[in-house]
């Protein structure tokens, strides 16, 4: 410190006082003949801060003048320290003060309590102000200061028992007083709150040095006395450390045991070489706990970033106390930077080479020992916070060698860092020397060459030499040193080092400059990571940003969005495809953290537009906002959606942020209902957030207009929880509303987040005619299936007189049951709440999948029975063996397929189609239904081909009896008609999954799919000759119908007679007849 004046000392004396106090002191003339200065007869003195209340009341009174010999050059009276006096009259002379070449001025006295009697003690303050010509006097005075002989005389003179220096003040060239307390003394806490501390070397003494602007700075107080043997102050606490040497990954534990009541407890860490400590607060690595008489600090996952001096600062007994412990943390292998990691070299072209290992600065002293060291020269140097050890190998080794850099520190095991050297031999495949951008030496095939980063950058540049001797691409991890330091600072802030309220604005102030200087993918990724950690700190600490801090964020965001896509973003996304999602999440979090007093706030940049408003409890109408973008963007939040948020007089802030170009930087991840298609975007992302107090709300109805659109719009939002936290577009809670009068795309969403609109040129048409056609077709199918059940009710015993007929009709009856249940479930599914979170919707989709599959598996069972009878003509089938197999095939197989599909696709969010209770056609779930169906149709086609060949053989008539042969012909006829129909239906179903298909296949598929029950009734039931004969004999009483159409007209009479027949007790087929088909 540069001083423009000589130092100044304050002197305290200590005397015991016995006897009755008096109100006036004597005024003798000094030996020099100088009388006391006039004007010092009375002076008002404040209480001694830090003592008990009774003492403060006692001394806050005027006091009488005291005769003090004065030097002609001093006339200022600073406050002093305390003393114990023996008599009521105190006179100090220059001889009693140990007269020297210094001038002095002293004053004594407080009006003692008149109630004190003889033998009582009172505390009296005596102050001495000494000026010295230079700095050599205070140390000399401290060594020679002794009690004067005159003070040992008997009463009435006082008995002076102590004389000690308390405060040393120095004045700089600006006239400021730097006053530091000497050993055993300290400024009171109330004074510390009003004056700034010195930037001095008083590291471990809290409130030990203050800066004053006036020449009467006050005085330092005597700390509470401790042990009479040590004469040290009594510290009201003990700090315990589990170990001063913490290994990497350990957990540090500091415990403070307090003997007095303490307040304002804080923990600090001073890094090696740092002038000021860092506040420690709860974070990802720091935890702070306190209980009665005890406080604890815990730091997990220790590393060299946590080495240094830990301090516990608190207030007790009117003073500030600092207790500290020094913690050492050894380095680990990942903390050491090696250059190179490996090296392949040709001794013919490079007789020597250089190796280095660099370590960060730490409070441990490290030395390096290289091995092998023959023919080499070791050295070291320091640069920008790191220490590097270099080995210059002057002779190339004859064979492959592994060099080791052994880092050693006293009391620690050596840390070995290996560097492998490969010698290129004659005949080895090598990559040639390349000096296009960086210098790449000759490298052996299969090895990685390394080069240092340019100046002011950290990292390394790598390049692989391929097995064929061709250089691969250059991979650089070079990152700007200042940006890397900012990232480390932000990460440590989240861990618990520093005050977020102070650190976050400072970090945000540096982001625009760092964004402007980012020149590599590593710079971009480090910048995005820094913004991510800042956002996490703001969210966890719930701090608010002022306008300047938010502007810095938006400026940095604008520069990041404006970075070159080809040279920076594409390469950065190749390493981390979710880099754009990281930026979006950080900006979302920070943009809504503006202080309420800074509203309203608007800010506009080429790629960033923000508007934030504050609303009181009684806002008049809907919230609406518009942005002058191309196309224009508008948003509206209805008043009824905001009303529940402003209860109890709460103010709400609504922040709307528009980001350009960001949607092109987000990964092409599409959630449920969007599939893997590529969508076009209008280039805008809208972020809306609502804050009520310190709470953020994510639910609320918002209506957005994204302007003119081409194609079919999909209203989406960016869901950060999709794809293992990497984010993706989702349609959940959003729906598109295309206005008929204008081509604009309107979106209605039930939550608040980052919105956009995706344009698909080819989408499934959402026409009312298709929905109506589906409902009508399913109704007709259900009605036809009920008619089919009624027919079997009437003619079951007639048509199952042989085993072939029994197997065929049992399979057909189970097909009817399954298809009837599936169609009913599918028809009722639209009335359920769609989405994977709806149990009823999930159940409906699972049942439809299972029942539709079961329908086709029973058709397969029917075809397999036919194939067996055609191949093994004289082999008879037993009911008790065939029926269980048919049941297993018809129900167990489709149940297994449906269960596997549910377990496989539901966790991935690709089970249900968006907005429907049916399988997703884009994610792959629908293929687990269409695939088995087409496979069964293919098997049925093979069986039919085999049956046609058998029918053409004349020997077929020599096989089974005529009745069985007729039954086989019925099976063949049904399969011959139903298989092509079902095959065509689901072939068209696959075609509808294509993006560029027209609307015609959708209509044909809907008609054929919904009328499956009608086809089964006509071609599986009514075309059977046995059934026709049974129905004619029972109801028609006429000639047999010549066609299916006439049979249908006949069946209309059947329906009218059904109630009459049932009343006559016509039996329904028993469970023995149907086997287990009813289940």
UniProtKB/Swiss-Prot annotation:
Localisation per UniProt entry: Membrane
Stretches of the chain found on the membrane's Cytoplasmic side: 797-811, 875-881, 950-973, 1024-1079
A GO cellular-component term linked to this record: membrane
SUPFAM superfamilies the UniProt entry points to: Family A G protein-coupled receptor-like, Hormone receptor domain
Superkingdom of origin: Eukaryota
Species in which this protein is naturally found: Homo sapiens (Human)
Post-translational modification: Autoproteolytically processed at the GPS region of the GAIN-B domain; this cleavage modulates receptor activity.
Transmembrane annotation, as ranges: 776-796, 812-832, 852-874, 882-902, 929-949, 974-994, 1003-1023
Entries under InterPro entries matching the protein: Adhesion_GPCR, GAIN_B, GAIN_dom_sf, GPCR_2-like_7TM, GPCR_2_extracell_dom_sf, GPCR_2_extracellular_dom, GPCR_2_secretin-like, GPCR_2_secretin-like_CS
Site location (Cleavage): 752-753
Function: Orphan receptor.
First-listed, main subcellular location of the protein, grouped into a coarse class: membrane
Extracellular side of membrane: 26-775, 833-851, 903-928, 995-1002
Sites carrying sugar chains: 188, 264, 301, 382, 441, 648
Pfam family, one: HRM
Assembly and interaction partners: Heterodimer of 2 chains generated by proteolytic processing; the large extracellular N-terminal fragment and the membrane-bound C-terminal fragment predominantly remain associated and non-covalently linked.
PANTHER family documented for this protein: ADHESION G-PROTEIN COUPLED RECEPTOR F3 (PTHR45813:SF2), IG-LIKE DOMAIN-CONTAINING PROTEIN (PTHR45813)
PROSITE patterns: G_PROTEIN_RECEP_F2_2 (PS00650), G_PROTEIN_RECEP_F2_3 (PS50227), G_PROTEIN_RECEP_F2_4 (PS50261), GAIN_B (PS50221)
Source species taxonomy: Eukaryota, Metazoa, Chordata, Craniata, Vertebrata
Region of interest: GPS: 715-765
Protein name: Adhesion G-protein coupled receptor F3
GO biological process: adenylate cyclase-activating G protein-coupled receptor signaling pathway; cell surface receptor signaling pathway; G protein-coupled receptor signaling pathway
Protein family according to the UniProt entry: Belongs to the G-protein coupled receptor 2 family. Adhesion G-protein coupled receptor (ADGR) subfamily.
Molecular-function GO terms, alphabetical: G protein-coupled receptor activity
Disulfide bridge partners, by residue number: 715-747, 734-749
Keyword terms, alphabetized: Disulfide bond, G-protein coupled receptor, Glycoprotein, Membrane, Receptor, Signal, Transducer, Transmembrane, Transmembrane helix
Membrane protein topology class: Multi-pass membrane protein
Statement: the UniProt record of this protein carries the keyword Disulfide bond: yes
């Amino acid at each position: 410190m540069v001083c423009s004046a000589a130092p100044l000392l304050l002197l305290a004396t200590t005397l015991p006082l016995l006897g009755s106090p008096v109100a006036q002191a004597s005024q003798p003339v000094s030996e020099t003949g100088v009388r006391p200065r006039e004007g010092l007869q009375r002076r008002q003195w404040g209480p001694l801060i830090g003592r008990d209340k009774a003492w403060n009341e006692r001394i806050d009174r005027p006091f009488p003048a005291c005769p003090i010999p004065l030097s002609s050059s001093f006339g200022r009276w600073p406050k002093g320290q305390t003393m114990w006096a023996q008599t009521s009259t105190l006179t100090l002379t220059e001889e009693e003060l140990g007269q020297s070449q210094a001038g002095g001025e002293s004053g004594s006295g407080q009006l003692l309590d008149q109630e004190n009697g003889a033998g009582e003690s009172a505390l009296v303050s005596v102050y001495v102000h000494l000026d010295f010509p230079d700095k050599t006097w205070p140390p000399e005075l401290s060594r020679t200061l002794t009690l004067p002989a005159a003070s040992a005389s008997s009463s009435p003179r006082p008995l002076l028992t102590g004389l000690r220096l308390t405060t040393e003040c120095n004045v700089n060239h600006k006239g400021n007083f730097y006053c530091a307390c000497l050993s055993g003394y300290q400024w009171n806490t109330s004074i510390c709150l009003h004056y700034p501390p010195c930037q001095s070397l008083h590291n471990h003494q809290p409130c030990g040095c203050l800066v004053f602007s006036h020449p009467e700075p006050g005085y330092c107080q005597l700390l509470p006395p401790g042990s009479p043997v040590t004469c040290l102050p009594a510290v009201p606490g003990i700090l315990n450390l589990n170990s001063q040497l913490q290994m990497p990954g350990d957990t540090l534990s500091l415990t403070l045991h307090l003997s007095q009541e303490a307040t304002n407890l804080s923990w600090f860490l001073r890094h090696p070489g740092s002038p000021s400590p860092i506040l420690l607060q709860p974070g990802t690595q720091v935890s702070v706990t306190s209980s009665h008489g005890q406080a604890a600090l815990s730091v997990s996952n220790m590393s060299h970033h946590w080495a240094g001096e830990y301090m516990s600062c608190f207030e007790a007994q009117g003073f500030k106390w600092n207790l500290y412990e020094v913690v050492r943390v050894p380095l680990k292998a990942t903390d050491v930077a090696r250059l190179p990691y490996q090296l392949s070299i040709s001794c013919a072209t490079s007789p020597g080479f250089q190796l280095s290992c660099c370590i960060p600065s730490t409070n441990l002293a490290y030395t390096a020992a290289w091995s092998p060291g023959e023919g080499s020269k070791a050295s070291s140097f320091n640069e920008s916070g790191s220490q590097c050890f270099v080995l210059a190998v002057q002779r190339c080794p004859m064979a492959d060698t592994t060099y080791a850099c052994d880092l050693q520190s006293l009391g620690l095991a050596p840390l070995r860092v290996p560097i492998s050297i490969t010698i290129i031999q004659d005949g080895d495949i090598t990559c040639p020397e390349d000096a296009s951008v960086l210098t790449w030496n000759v490298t052996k095939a299969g090895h990685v060459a390394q080069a240092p980063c340019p100046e002011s950058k950290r990292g390394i540049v790598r390049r692989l030499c391929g097995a064929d001797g061709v250089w691969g691409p250059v991979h650089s991890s070079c990152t700007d040193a200042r940006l890397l330091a900012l990232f480390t600072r932000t990460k440590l802030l989240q861990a618990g080092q520093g005050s977020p309220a102070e650190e976050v604005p400072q970090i945000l102030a540096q982001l625009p400059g760092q964004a402007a200087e980012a020149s590599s993918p590593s710079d971009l990724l480090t910048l995005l990571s820094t913004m991510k950690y800042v956002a996490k700190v703001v969210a966890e600490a719930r701090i608010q940003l002022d306008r300047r801090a938010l502007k810095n964020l938006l400026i940095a965001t604008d520069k990041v969005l404006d970075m070159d896509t080809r040279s920076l973003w594409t390469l950065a996304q190749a390493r981390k495809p979710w880099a754009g999602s990281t930026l979006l999440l950080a900006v979302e979090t920070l943009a809504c953290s503006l202080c309420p007093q800074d509203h309203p706030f608007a800010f506009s940049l080429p790629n960033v537009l923000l508007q934030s408003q504050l609303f009181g409890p009684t806002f008049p109408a809907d919230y609406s906002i518009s942005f002058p973008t191309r196309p224009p963007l508008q948003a509206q939040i209805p008043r009824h959606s905001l009303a529940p948020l402003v209860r109890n007089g709460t103010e709400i802030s609504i922040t709307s942020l528009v980001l350009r170009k960001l949607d092109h930087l987000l990964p092409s991840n599409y959630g449920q209902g969007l599939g893997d298609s590529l969508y076009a975007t209008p280039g805008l992302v809208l972020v809306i957030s609502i804050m009520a107090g310190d709470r953020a709300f994510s639910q609320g109805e918002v209506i957005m207009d994204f302007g003119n659109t081409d194609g079919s719009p999909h209203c989406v939002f960016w869901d950060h929880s999709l794809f293992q936290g990497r984010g993706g577009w989702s349609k959940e809670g959003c729906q598109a509303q295309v206005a008929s009068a204008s081509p604009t795309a309107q979106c209605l969403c039930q939550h608040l987040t980052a919105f956009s609109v995706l344009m698909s040129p080819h989408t499934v048409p959402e026409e009312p005619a298709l929905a109506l056609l589906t409902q009508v077709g399913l109704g007709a199918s259900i009605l036809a299936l009920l008619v089919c059940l009624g027919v079997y009710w009437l003619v079951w015993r007639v048509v199952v007189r042989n085993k072939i007929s029994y197997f065929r009709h049992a399979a057909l009856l189970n097909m009817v049951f399954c298809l009837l249940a599936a169609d009913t479930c599918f028809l009722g599914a639209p009335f359920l709440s769609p989405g994977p979170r709806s149990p009823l919707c999930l159940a409906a989709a699972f049942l439809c999948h299972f029942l539709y599959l079961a329908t086709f598996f029973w058709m397969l069972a029917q075809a397999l029975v036919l194939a067996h009878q055609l191949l093994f003509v004289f082999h008879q089938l037993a009911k008790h063996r065939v029926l269980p197999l048919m049941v297993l095939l018809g129900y167990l197989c489709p149940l297994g397929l449906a269960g596997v599909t549910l377990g496989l696709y539901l966790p991935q969010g690709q089970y249900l189609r968006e907005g429907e209770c049916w399988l997703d056609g884009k994610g792959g779930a629908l293929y687990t239904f269409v695939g088995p169906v087409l496979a069964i149709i293919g098997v049925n086609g093979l069986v039919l081909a085999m049956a046609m060949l058998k029918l053409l053989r004349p020997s077929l008539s020599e096989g089974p009896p005529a009745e069985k042969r007729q039954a086989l012909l019925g099976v063949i006829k049904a399969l011959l008609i139903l298989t092509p129909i079902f095959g065509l239906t689901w072939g068209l179903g696959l075609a509808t999954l294509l993006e560029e298909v027209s609307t015609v296949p959708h209509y044909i598929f809907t008609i054929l799919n919904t009328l499956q029950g009608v086809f089964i009734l006509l071609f599986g039931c009514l075309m059977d000759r046995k059934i026709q004969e049974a129905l004619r004999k029972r109801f028609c009483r006429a000639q047999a119908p010549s066609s299916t159409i006439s049979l249908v007209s006949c069946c209309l009479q059947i329906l009218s007679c059904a109630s009459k027949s049932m009343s006559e007790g016509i039996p329904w087929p028993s469970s023995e007849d149907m086997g287990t088909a009813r289940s």
